[in-house]
């Protein structure tokens, strides 16, 4: 299987899809970091480089969906998988080696974006007040998210069986997971209490000044109890939910996230091998 992985890395080195994705992601990372810097100047908010370090996370699922579907999907169209079978490799070896190559390529794109954002952000905004341990934990969690995404879309590509179909299905799934994650995160971000102006009955609250008295009232949109636990679970187990939390610097359960990523990666790999064994390769 080492030969399969080595051959896969050689293809990555020659892949236009891989290099295009890496360049575009790095450009976007640099742009977001510079934007965070100018926001700190305009709003007089003491931003640090970590504020622009993980914002790229939210689009990584889309980048990985496109890359895996195009790169791995090409293996179907050019007969490479069939040739590997003829060469004496088992279907399990072929699938696992392809996943390893896909995951490694996605990690290279991810780490390159972190490196660009980190160096640029450190130069522009400094590192005062930054927690090195927090950054390390977040980077590890982000890497786990990328590996899980690679496992998911490798499985999806095998399930669909065509490059074009896998690309469309991957983007649709990626957007769905991202939109769902943002909706759940928005619900969980509601404060338990809200403050409204305290006025006499029928009083005018159209004008609020520094002297206006505020009263604390329960927020009707705050989610609590079992429903909140369920939403937290959905956010943590969804790779895009992890990305949204990382981008907001609000990953409160990193241990659980890493466990979920490990379990999902194993699940998608197992299902992928099972389906690939049933595939009739042309």
Model feature map: region roles:
Residues 16-18, 91, 163, 281:
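Membrane-helix interface/capping residues of multi-pass secondary transporters
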Residues 2, 22, 237-282:
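Alpha-helical transmembrane segments of multi-pass membrane transporters/translocases
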Residues 1-22:
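Aromatic- and glycine-rich beta-strand/loop motifs that create alpha-glucan
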Residues 68-87, 91:
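Transmembrane helix boundary and interhelical loop/hinge segments in multi-pass membrane proteins
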Residues 18, 26-71, 96-170, 178, ...:
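Secretory targeting signals
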